[in-house]
Amino acid sequence: MPPPILPTANITIHPSPLTLSSFHPFGTAISSPLPATLRAPSATSLSSLPNTDPNPSDTPTPILANQSTALKYSPISVFQNNYDQSKSAEGRGKSKDGVPRMSMFSCFPRALRRGGGRGRKPAGGLFDVRILERHPYTTQTFIPLGVPSGVDRKRPENENKSLSTGARNKHDDGDNGNPVPSYLVIIAPSLHGQTAQATVVNAQGRKEQVLIRDPPDLRNMKAFIAHGGQAVTYGAGTWHAPMVVVGRRRVDFVVVQFANGIAEDDCQEVAFGEGIVVDVDMDVDITEMEEYEDEVAKL
């Protein structure tokens, strides 16, 4: 059955950079507190390395680990299992336990339509938000694999060749002026204790009215731009869009959460018609995206 459709007004969201403090009301933004250019410090300097987090109190105090060759920051994110509160337990006195689950989502670039940019530059476009989901009893963490961080793409060519990790491939997205893939984190707080009326099409094709518990607060939707050096944890019950990758390259995410196999407990969805858009005003060339989509269509 398709997800219920909520009515909505026209809403345009302008994304901001993903930071620990800006995302704190909705979950956890995860990134290294160390300078991106740091490669091989001396062992004696590990305990006094600079912290790039603008709010050091938000970052756990590191401890030396691995025979004093590493710094361990713990905990860096909440890992929450609230399945003992699940609605499926009502009427039978016992819930089905949530168990840890690790998955991989290979996310391909989303289509943007022309427009937006607030007149500042031709790059970017509009992303139409047509669906939100939430996991009412579990956090959900997305960890991107193999994507350069935003700082990596700004290094001069001669510095790339001198890195202790080896020279980068000349075809990397960070070279030759190609934008590094980024992703949008689109969220809406839950209106706890409230309900909203939505329309659903039943198995017979008839429209029915249903009530959505703890619906998304669409007036306070936000979007954040994240790069490959950042992971994100959605708080339990936080409404969010499925992952939105922008650019010309697939991004693979390792996803960590709890689940119990009961659809209504694990994931709840609401859909929308036209009206909610994110103005993706960033280093994404809409013409290149259209050419990329044409190439994919020919495969």
Identify what each model region corresponds to:
Residues V245-L299:
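Double-stranded beta-helix
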Residues P181-Y183, K222, Q230, R249-D252:
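A short pocket-lining beta-strand/turn micro-motif at the edge of beta-sheets
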